[in-house]
């Protein structure tokens, strides 16, 4: 699938469309004309207008990796302790994970240079776990599924235009992105699906929680250029984790770099290709219940005993990843855009063992609503002329 996606990315960007014309883009001309919907992009939207985005997203993870090397689940399963010594084996290991998200973003352009918005998120996690032979005998099951779902963290965001070569129809512009993630997602989710009743009151591991538990600032720099029918851009974003949450840990800092190119081959359609690079650090600290042994240890309430699964080790989080993404945008009606994109990893180096990403898919419905103060506001539809048309 990875090779096929890269092939089509190259083919669609290289192919010649003889019917291409000079377009101003599917979005408003002031914001740059075209911009990606799955990442922050473009400039500042038309002044005094609202923007809304509804984006369901699905990500699939499958198989384990340590660094760049694939490892099998069976190689990690076994007796965690033998003759009083830890073996490095685990009672259960993850084999796959499905993550579903629904994002709703609302924003408003306050001036020619300033845009503000808020993004609300709902998340559903499902992770398949395989048991060791000992646990299979104890539970009578070969595996089980950990689940969590609910409201995730909320993002407040803003963009300030630093530079533009034209105030109305820019072909080059740069913007400053700034944001603050609010800890509205739960960090108290429990392992209620575990087949052993004594484990059902334990907390879920870090990656199955719904939020970070901290207020996390984000800052970024966005650049976009265009020469119709082509658009391109680069976005660099950094998210800092500055302190431990109420459960005595904090997620690792994150850095993201996105490069994108777009080709508008019709007045209401375009194709896009992206390279999405990301780095995220290890978890700092340790969950309070893991420190006391109440959750995540082979011997309950004994924090000196080994972890039940590699998911409880804070060092098994973080890494580097590069995705190749191919997308399509369609404008079915004025002020509306439908965006579909699919991304697959072309490189992953993980602080493992941890699950590898297989692919992700996102569908976005984007709507622009001019207010009465916008230059694009239309008071009423034009009637028929005296000639009847």
PLM feature spans:
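Residues on the lipid-exposed face of transmembrane beta-strands in outer-membrane beta-barrel proteins
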Residues: 41-43, 54-56, 104-108, 118, ...
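Outer membrane beta-barrel transmembrane domains
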Residues: 65-67, 71-84, 247-389
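Short loop/turn motifs that connect adjacent beta-strands in outer-membrane beta-barrel proteins
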Residues: 22-29, 40-49, 61-65, 113, ...
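Surface-exposed strand-loop-strand hairpins of Gram-negative outer-membrane beta-barrel proteins
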Residues: 25-28, 60-99
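Residues that define the transmembrane beta-barrel architecture of outer-membrane proteins
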Residues: 48, 98-102, 148-156, 172, ...
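Residue-level detector of the transmembrane beta-barrel scaffold of outer-membrane proteins
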Residues: 51-53, 115-117, 157, 173-177, ...
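Extracellular loop and loop/strand-boundary signature of outer-membrane beta-barrel proteins
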Residues: 39-40, 88-92, 139-146, 204-209, ...
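Outer-membrane pore/translocation modules
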Residues: 121-245, 316, 370
């Amino acid at each position: 699938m990875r090779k096929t996606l890269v092939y089509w990315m190259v083919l669609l960007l290289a192919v010649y469309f003889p019917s291409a014309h000079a377009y101003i883009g599917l979005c408003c001309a002031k914001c740059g004309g075209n911009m990606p919907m799955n990442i922050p992009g473009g400039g500042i939207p038309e002044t005094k207008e609202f923007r809304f985005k509804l984006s369901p997203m699905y990500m699939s993870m499958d198989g384990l990796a340590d660094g760049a090397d694939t490892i099998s689940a069976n190689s990690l399963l076994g007796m965690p302790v033998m003759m009083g010594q830890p073996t490095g084996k685990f009672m259960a290991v993850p084999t796959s994970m499905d993550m579903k998200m629904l994002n709703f973003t609302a924003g408003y352009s306050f001036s020619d240079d300033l845009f503000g918005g808020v993004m609300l998120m709902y998340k559903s996690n499902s992770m398949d776990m395989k048991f060791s032979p000992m646990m299979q005998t104890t539970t009578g099951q070969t595996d089980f599924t950990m689940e969590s779902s609910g409201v995730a963290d909320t993002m407040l965001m803003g963009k300030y235009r630093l530079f533009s070569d034209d105030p109305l129809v820019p072909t080059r512009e740069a913007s400053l992105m700034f944001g603050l993630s609010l800890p509205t997602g739960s960090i108290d989710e429990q392992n209620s699906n575990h087949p052993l009743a004594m484990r059902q009151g334990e907390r879920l591991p870090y990656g199955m929680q719904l939020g970070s538990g901290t207020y996390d600032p984000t800052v970024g720099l966005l650049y976009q250029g265009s020469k119709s029918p082509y658009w391109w851009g680069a976005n660099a974003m950094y998210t800092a984790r500055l302190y431990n949450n109420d459960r005595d840990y904090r997620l690792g800092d994150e850095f993201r770099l996105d490069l994108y190119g777009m080709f508008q081959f019709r007045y209401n359609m375009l194709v896009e290709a992206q390279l999405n690079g990301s780095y995220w650090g290890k978890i700092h600290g340790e969950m309070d219940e893991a420190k006391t042994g109440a959750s995540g240890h082979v011997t309950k309430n004994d924090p000196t005993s080994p972890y039940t699964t590699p998911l409880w080790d804070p060092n098994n989080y973080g890494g580097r990843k590069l995705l190749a993404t191919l997308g399509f945008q369609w404008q079915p009606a004025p002020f509306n855009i439908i965006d579909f994109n699919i991304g697959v990893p072309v490189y992953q180096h993980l602080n493992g063992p941890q699950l590898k990403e297989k692919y992700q898919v996102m569908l976005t419905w984007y709507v622009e609503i001019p207010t009465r103060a916008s230059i694009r506001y239309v008071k009423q539809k034009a009637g028929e002329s005296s000639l009847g048309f």
